[in-house]
């Protein structure tokens, strides 16, 4: 194991009956990083988290924690804690008692418990809430208590299984920022599970995109968004225009009946590829100046931008723009070479 890795998953396979949930999955998780397991329902992300936590056992493969294989170590002996979507707080205990519960089980001296609980209350911005009943708290406050209860035990890794899923959109966005701040203050590893692309892009140092029990791509939010490894990632992370094309040569691609400059190289000459263009990367120009040209067939106001469909003989293009366009009008679309992303063509996708 490399010195900066805290967890290694090596060839993890897990099945339930005839259904393979994880298929020979391997993953390195670094110390002090915020890593997100992202994917649709049933992709294996929560099962991966449970295997790390010790709540599930892999059929084969190794879970390595700080150079030690921990497959047979029970959850309560692993140096990590888990926060679930259902916070499982004790309703008969107040905020202080909930946070202190794990420390009391370990028979930590009362003065140290008091010190640690106060530190956690400050960390999660709940100072003064010590004596509040759990049921008197908002959803966001309950979540903060659950996080404090997990962190007060000083785990080296915090596992979070869709903890924001039950919150409304405004509170969810606020808690995304708060969670990232907490992780940065503590400097420990967070492993976060979600199906929400915005959550992953907002909080993560590293995103692991999963589908059907396999890792599709692993990288920074910028890499995942700007350079998707395949069609699944391109479609799952944000909105994309995906079209077939031909890589004519290094830095030269043909699609939509036109030839474009691009920044990609290393493909075979005349190789069939797929082109990804994000809707926000199109620029609307006069019809006669367009690299691509078409007719506006739909326009929807999305608040911060309009979503516009432009159709021509080859394709229907989706673009996001702050400018309005009339349905039926003819417009041109312009692209920078950096906005054209080339992917290997996958016949089975």
Curated annotation (Swiss-Prot):
The lineage of its organism: Bacteria, Bacillati, Bacillota, Clostridia, Eubacteriales. This is Spermidine/putrescine import ATP-binding protein PotA. InterPro entries: AAA+_ATPase (IPR003593), ABC_SmlMolc_Importer (IPR050093), ABC_transporter-like_ATP-bd (IPR003439), ABC_transporter-like_CS (IPR017871), Mo/tungstate-bd_C_term_dom (IPR008995), NA-bd_OB-fold (IPR012340), P-loop_NTPase (IPR027417), PotA-like (IPR005893). It is found in: Cell membrane. Residues 7-237 form the ABC transporter domain. SMART domains: AAA. It catalyses: ATP + H2O + polyamine-[polyamine-binding protein]Side 1 = ADP + phosphate + polyamineSide 2 + [polyamine-binding protein]Side 1. Keywords: ATP-binding, Cell membrane, Membrane, Nucleotide-binding, Translocase, Transport. Its main location: membrane. GO terms for cellular component: ATP-binding cassette (ABC) transporter complex. The complex is composed of two ATP-binding proteins (PotA), two transmembrane proteins (PotB and PotC) and a solute-binding protein (PotD). SUPFAM superfamilies: MOP-like, P-loop containing nucleoside triphosphate hydrolases. It is a peripheral membrane protein. Part of the ABC transporter complex PotABCD involved in spermidine/putrescine import. Responsible for energy coupling to the transport system. It comes from Clostridium perfringens (strain SM101 / Type A). Signal peptide: none annotated. ATP binds at residues 39-46.
């Amino acid at each position: 194991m490399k010195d900066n890795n805290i967890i290694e998953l090596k060839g993890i396979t897990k099945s339930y009956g005839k259904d393979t949930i994880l298929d020979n999955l391997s993953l390195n998780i670094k110390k002090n990083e915020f890593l997100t397991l992202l994917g649709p329902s049933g992709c294996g992300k929560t099962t991966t988290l449970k295997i790390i936590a010790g709540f599930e056992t892999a059929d084969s493969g190794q879970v390595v924690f700080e150079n030690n294989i921990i497959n047979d170590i029970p959850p309560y002996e692993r140096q990590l804690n888990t926060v679930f979507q259902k916070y499982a707080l004790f309703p008969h205990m107040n905020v202080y008692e909930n946070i202190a519960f794990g420390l009391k089980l370990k028979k930590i001296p009362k003065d140290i418990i008091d010190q640690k609980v106060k530190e956690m209350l400050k960390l999660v911005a709940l100072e003064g809430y010590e004596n509040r009943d759990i049921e008197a708290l908002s959803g966001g406050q309950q979540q903060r208590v659950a996080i404090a209860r997990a962190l007060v035990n000083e785990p080296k890794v915090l596992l979070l299984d869709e903890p924001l899923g039950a919150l409304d959109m405004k509170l969810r966005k606020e808690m995304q920022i708060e969670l990232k701040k907490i992780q940065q203050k503590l400097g420990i590893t967070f492993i976060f599970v979600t199906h929400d692309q915005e959550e992953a892009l907002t909080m993560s140092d590293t995103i692991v995109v999963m589908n059907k029990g396999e890792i599709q791509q692993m990288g920074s939010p910028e890499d995942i968004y700007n350079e998707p490894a395949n069609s699944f990632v391109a479609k799952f992370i944000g909105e994309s225009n995906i079209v077939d094309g031909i890589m004519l040569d290094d830095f030269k691609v043909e699609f939509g009946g036109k030839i474009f400059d691009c920044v990609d190289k290393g493909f075979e000459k005349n190789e069939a590829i797929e082109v990804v263009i994000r809707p926000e990367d199109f620029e609307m120009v006069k019809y006669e100046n367009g690299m691509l040209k078409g007719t506006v067939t739909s326009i929807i106001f999305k608040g911060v931008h309009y979503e516009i469909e432009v159709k021509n003989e080859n394709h229907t293009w989706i673009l996001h723009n702050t400018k309005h366009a009339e349905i039926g009008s003819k417009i041109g679309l312009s692209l920078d070479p950096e906005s054209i992303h080339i992917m290997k063509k996958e016949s089975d996708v």
